[in-house]
């Protein structure tokens, strides 16, 4: 029987059909090769937007710098970065007038956070530019290397473990005449393999000391490494993103903490909340505008797009904002917060790996590192690359480019949101002093603008005024990419609003499926995704039931664990059949052991082991939840784990799922090939670092972990904690006298060893 597809939509309100227009199936595009070209594009564009600014030279590094602030007022609609300081300050003042005490209170909250933040805050985050090795590293390793170098250069404030003290070291390091660092290098030699008698290349890792003079050190401290942004859909061209080094990160973190505290108090800010909370916030603003537009008023909404948001932002604007926001605060606080924008005004962008050349005829490939771009003959490059390099040459120093204007992607999301909201705030009638008025929503570079006026001319005038006001602070609303609609239909941060937010369930499609962590986690994540979508995204009961059946099917195919009584032959079926036959209570077998599925949409919140526990054979329970089972290498499992799920749009989201430790929670072993490379020493460092952190967390469970431990070292803190805990346990009879004595002896031994060292 043929079904007329239009019948499917008879009972569905039109806006729900958005899920059927979903274009993003399949994998997103990834970038290959070097990001050097994209970074050059960014640098050249940024300078072009600010080209009428003043050029100066940095006295310390010799880098040429362009300052567009208080530059010429725009005469056309081209994007430009000429923000006017007095306009920015005035916008801040009006924002404070509309929200009395907002800056004062946010500063107090931030000061409290600064006093308590530990330096391990910087181990969060993925790739980080490691200035000691001049390349990217995992955040924890980069931090460890930085601290190691600081200590060997006599900078020891960081030993207190507080982030603010580490930052004192950073500031001091910039005044030093030279810094001694340890770098890794590779030696390659050709040797004959005893077994195969073939020649093989053997790599050995050496560490060598190197001295950096003040200028070289400053350049590295101010460097942002660049990479290509991966997995961006809907774009033909890739673009560059920045990874800052450890010197900048801590300062940025504190500025963003302040800005986050401000954003939380602003009803027009789409950050830092997300999900349903964000939708509620936005719906309120829309409701306010629609209620206030009486029958006589028109209300229109612009789904806005800004041209090159961060390339037109300027660190100097942020410095002005911070100076104003913190104006009545203690000196130390103002200084700490103003360092991030100052560093960004003097930042250097690293050009990445450089260019790859290959000669087809001679089968040769060679890499031209970024350092050589200053001197190499340009005849080897094609037209467009040649133009890029010519433009960038005056800015080059040692393979990095001086990039004073612009912000690089994703650095000051919160603070730039405050700037955007301050312009939305100026739309109140008491400020526009005319018949039109506006309000809206801002989330980093994304905005929605709602304009109310008695007639169409008024709407037009309101939009124009908003547009021009934005120009004055370096925000460029794109007239080509923004569109206007009667209020009630618009899009903001991929949320579609049509008389209420429309659940776009198809956005979540890529996160349905088997994650590939291990059998235990995958089952848990799979059902949690379905549960979350029923709660948040209008996933209906029938569809959810179908999604669940598809997921179980997918899971069985992935792990080859079809039911014990199935006819399907796989590598595992022989073992699973045997298990099926010798199990008395077959209902108790997990799906991954060839059991049947007990999940339905009512019990998705219960981990599978708990769901089937009462139904299991006793010996099966014993095998399944046996931490000494020799066939399983265990992660230590918290009761709640975090998984990263990929929605189709926007960043990967962290999602909590219940973790029950069983023999199915195995961890795959690491690929051995890394052990033969230059990364090996780093890997060992990282593992040692990880072990120390884990040990520390054992002594200080997370509740007491964030409090500063005074000036003692980690070891001292752990020893004193062990003594206190042992005494309490001994006095309450939880441990015997011998055990207590042994613990005390171990503590004394550790202290003795420290003294000898």
Swiss-Prot record:
Subcellular location: Host nucleus; Host cytoplasm
Subunit architecture: Influenza RNA polymerase is composed of three subunits: PB1, PB2 and PA. Interacts (via N-terminus) with PA (via C-terminus). Interacts (via C-terminus) with PB2 (via N-terminus); this interaction is essential for transcription initiation.
Modification note: Phosphorylated by host PRKCA.
Similarity remark: Belongs to the influenza viruses polymerase PB1 family.
Residue ranges of the motif Nuclear localization signal: 187-195, 203-216
Domain of life: Viruses
Biased composition (Polar residues): 55-64
EC numbers: 2.7.7.48
InterPro entries in the record: RNA-dir_pol_NSvirus (IPR007099), RNA_pol_PB1_influenza (IPR001407)
GO MF term list: nucleotide binding; RNA binding; RNA-directed RNA polymerase activity
Transmembrane region(s): none
Purpose of the protein: RNA-dependent RNA polymerase which is responsible for replication and transcription of virus RNA segments. The transcription of viral mRNAs occurs by a unique mechanism called cap-snatching. 5' methylated caps of cellular mRNAs are cleaved after 10-13 nucleotides by PA. In turn, these short capped RNAs are used as primers by PB1 for transcription of viral mRNAs. During virus replication, PB1 initiates RNA synthesis and copy vRNA into complementary RNA (cRNA) which in turn serves as a template for the production of more vRNAs.
Region Disordered, annotated ranges: 50-82
Span list, region Promoter-binding site: 249-256
Reaction(s) the record says it catalyses: RNA(n) + a ribonucleoside 5'-triphosphate = RNA(n+1) + diphosphate
Keywords tagged on the record: Eukaryotic host gene expression shutoff by virus, Eukaryotic host transcription shutoff by virus, Host cytoplasm, Host gene expression shutoff by virus, Host nucleus, Host-virus interaction, Inhibition of host RNA polymerase II by virus, Nucleotide-binding, Nucleotidyltransferase, Phosphoprotein, RNA-directed RNA polymerase, Transferase, Viral RNA replication, Viral transcription
Ranges where the RdRp catalytic domain occurs: 286-483
Disulfide bond positions: none
GO biological process: DNA-templated transcription; symbiont-mediated suppression of host gene expression; symbiont-mediated suppression of host mRNA transcription via inhibition of RNA polymerase II activity; viral RNA genome replication; viral transcription
Name of protein: RNA-directed RNA polymerase catalytic subunit
């Amino acid at each position: 029987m043929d079904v007329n597809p239009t019948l499917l939509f008879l009972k569905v309100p039109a806006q729900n059909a958005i899920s059927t227009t979903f274009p993003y199936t399949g994998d997103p595009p990834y970038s290959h090769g070097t990001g050097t070209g994209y970074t050059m594009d960014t640098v050249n564009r940024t300078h072009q937007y600010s080209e009428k600014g003043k050029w100066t030279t940095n006295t310390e590094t010799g880098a040429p710098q362009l300052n567009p602030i208080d530059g010429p007022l725009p005469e056309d609609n081209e994007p430009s970065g000429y923000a006017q300081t007095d306009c920015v300050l005035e916008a801040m003042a009006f924002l404070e007038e509309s929200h009395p005490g907002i800056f004062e209170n946010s500063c107090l909250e931030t000061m409290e956070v600064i006093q308590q933040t530990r330096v391990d805050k910087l181990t969060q985050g993925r790739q980080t530019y490691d200035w000691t090795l001049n390349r990217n590293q995992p955040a924890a390793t980069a931090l460890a290397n930085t601290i190691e170098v600081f200590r060997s250069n006599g900078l020891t404030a960081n030993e207190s473990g507080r982030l603010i003290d580490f930052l004192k070291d950073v500031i001091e390091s910039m005044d030093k005449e030279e810094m001694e660092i340890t770098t890794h290098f590779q030696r390659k030699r050709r040797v004959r393999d005893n077994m195969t008698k073939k020649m093989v290349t053997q790599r050995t890792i050496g560490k060598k000391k190197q001295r950096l003079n003040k200028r070289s050190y400053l350049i590295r401290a101010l460097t942002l490494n660049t990479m290509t942004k991966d997995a961006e859909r809907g774009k033909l061209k890739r673009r560059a993103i920045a990874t800052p080094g450890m010197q900048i990160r801590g300062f940025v973190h504190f500025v963003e903490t302040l800005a986050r505290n401000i954003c939380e108090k602003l009803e027009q800010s789409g950050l830092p909340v997300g999900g349903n909370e964000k939708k509620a916030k936005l719906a309120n603003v829309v409701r306010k505008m629609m209620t206030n537009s009486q029958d006589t008023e028109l209300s229109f909404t612009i789904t806005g797009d800004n041209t090159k948001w961060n390339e037109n932002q300027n660190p100097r604007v942020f410095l002005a904002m911070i100076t104003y926001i913190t104006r009545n605060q203690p000196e130390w606080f103002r200084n700490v917060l103003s360092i991030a924008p100052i560093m960004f005004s003097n930042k250097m962008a690293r050009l990445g790996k450089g260019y790859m050349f290959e000669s087809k005829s001679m089968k040769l490939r060679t890499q031209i590192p970024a350092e050589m771009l200053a001197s190499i003959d340009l005849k080897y490059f094609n037209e467009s690359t040649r133009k890029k390099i010519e433009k960038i040459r005056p800015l080059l120093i040692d393979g990095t480019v001086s990039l004073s204007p612009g912000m690089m992607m994703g650095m000051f999301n919160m603070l730039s949101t405050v700037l955007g909201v301050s312009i939305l705030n100026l739309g109140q009638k008491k400020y526009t002093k005319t018949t039109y008025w506006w309000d809206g929503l801002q989330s980093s570079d994304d905005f929605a603008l709602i304009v109310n006026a008695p007639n169409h001319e008024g709407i037009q005038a309101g939009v124009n005024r908003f547009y021009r006001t934005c120009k004055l602070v370096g925000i460029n609303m794109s007239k080509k990419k923004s569109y206007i609609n009667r209020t009630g239909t618009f899009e903001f941060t991929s949320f579609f609003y049509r008389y209420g937010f429309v659940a776009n369930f198809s956005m979540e499609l890529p996160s349905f499926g088997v994650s590939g962590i291990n059998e235990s986690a995958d089952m848990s994540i799979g059902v949690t995704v379905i549960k979350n979508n029923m709660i948040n995204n209008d996933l209906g009961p029938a569809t959810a039931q179908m999604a669940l059946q598809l997921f179980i099917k997918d899971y069985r195919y992935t792990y080859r664990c079809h039911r014990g009584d199935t006819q399907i032959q796989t590598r595992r079926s022989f073992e699973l059949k045997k298990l099926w036959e010798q199990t008395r209570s077959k209902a108790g077998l997990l799906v991954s052991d060839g059991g049947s599925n007990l999940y339905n949409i009512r019990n998705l919140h219960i981990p599978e082991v708990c769901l089937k526990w009462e139904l299991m054979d006793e010996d099966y329970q014993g095998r399944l939840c046996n931490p000494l089972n020799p066939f399983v290498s265990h992660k230590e499992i918290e009761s709640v784990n975090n998984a990263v799920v990929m929605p189709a749009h926007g960043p990967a989201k962290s999602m909590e799922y219940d973790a029950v430790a069983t023999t199915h929670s195995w961890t795959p072993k690491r690929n051995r090939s890394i052990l033969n490379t230059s990364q090996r020493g780093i890997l060992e460092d990282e593992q040692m670092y990880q072990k120390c952190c884990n040990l520390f967390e054992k002594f200080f469970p997370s509740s007491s972990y964030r409090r500063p431990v005074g000036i003692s070292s980690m070891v001292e803190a752990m020893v004193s904690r062990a003594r206190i805990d042992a005494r309490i346990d001994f006095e309450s009879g939880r441990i015997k006298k011998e055990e207590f004595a042994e613990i005390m002896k171990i503590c004394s031994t550790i202290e003795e060893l420290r003294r000898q060292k």
